[in-house]
A protein has these predicted regions:
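Structured alpha/beta reader/binder surfaces that contact nucleic acids or chromatin modification marks
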Residues: 2-145
Length: 145
């Protein structure tokens, strides 16, 4: 199993539905619409920020996975069981992920926060006790690959 290193680049990404967690766990990928994608997809890890759909686990980071690669495909290719979706032809990043790792200490957002994507580092992720502690200072953010 991959080990999170202190200087690894981590993309914190929203996980809107239970189905998305199962896709990551079972099929080994996560989807990001190209039109709302962060500037940098080439990261070492992806950490998942859980939404209200996760009940008692909402608004927290509990899982992460190593990023194995990515490709650009249509939403319809990713979710063939939903061919009539309004965004079926839209381009999405299919981010291949390795096995999910459950954090020893979940990272809650003590106050609700609207998060789509943010970058952090392995050391910040392992030390954080609140999601707000993950944000990189401007000089650190510029140094990220």
């Amino acid at each position: 199993m991959a080990k999170l290193e202190p200087d690894d680049v981590v993309l914190v990404a929203i996980l809107p539905e239970l189905r998305d967690l199962e896709i990551a766990r079972v099929l080994g990928w996560y989807r990001i619409p190209l039109k709302s994608a962060p500037k940098m997809i080439r990261v070492d890890w992806i950490a998942f920020y859980l939404t209200a759909a996760f009940g008692d686990e909402k608004w927290s980071i509990r899982y992460l996975a190593p990023v194995m690669g990515y490709e650009l495909v249509s939403r319809g290719e990713l979710l063939a069981d939903d061919p009539d979706h309004p965004y079926a032809d839209e381009p999405y990043y299919k981010v291949a992920v390795g096995p999910l790792v459950q954090l020893t200490h979940p990272i809650p957002a003590r106050r609700w926060r609207r998060i789509t994507f943010l970058y952090t580092t392995g050391d910040k992720l392992l030390a954080a006790r609140d999601v707000k502690e993950l944000t990189l200072k401007r000089s650190s953010a510029n140094a990220v690959r």
